[in-house]
Curated annotation (Swiss-Prot):
This is Phosphoribosyl-ATP pyrophosphatase. GO terms for cellular component: cytoplasm. The lineage of its organism: Archaea, Thermoproteota, Thermoprotei, Sulfolobales, Sulfolobaceae. It holds the Pfam family PRA-PH. Pathway: Amino-acid biosynthesis; L-histidine biosynthesis; L-histidine from 5-phospho-alpha-D-ribose 1-diphosphate: step 2/9. GO terms for molecular function: ATP binding; phosphoribosyl-ATP diphosphatase activity. It catalyses: 1-(5-phospho-beta-D-ribosyl)-ATP + H2O = 1-(5-phospho-beta-D-ribosyl)-5'-AMP + diphosphate + H(+).
């Protein structure tokens, strides 16, 4: 996976959080508050686990994408950037 798509999606999420456009799923979940977004991360985590154990590869990929998206929204609300995560992963690699 290219970092660029993650970085691009994160920028879109930041824009949606700032502007809160009508019809935006990101704006909708952010308007419900950080606890709601955190619960969505938990829900998507469980769905990813279930897909890995009982479903096909395409379903697993879809659930992982949902999990990553919701993690990015939660990261944005916490002020954590993808670059912060890349640095931490790099640090752990050493």
């Amino acid at each position: 996976m290219s970092n660029e798509i993650v970085d691009e999606l994160y920028k879109i999420i930041l824009d949606r959080i700032e502007k809160r456009p009508t019809g935006s799923y990101t704006a909708e979940i952010v308007n419900k508050g950080k606890p709601y977004v955190a619960r969505k991360v938990g829900e998507e985590s469980v769905e990813t686990i279930v897909a890995s154990l009982a479903e096909n590869k395409e379903r697993f990929i879809s659930e992982v994408a949902d999990l990553i998206y919701h993690l990015l929204v939660l990261m944005a609300l916490e002020g954590v950037t993808p670059e912060d995560i890349y640095r931490e992963l790099e640090r752990r690699r050493k």
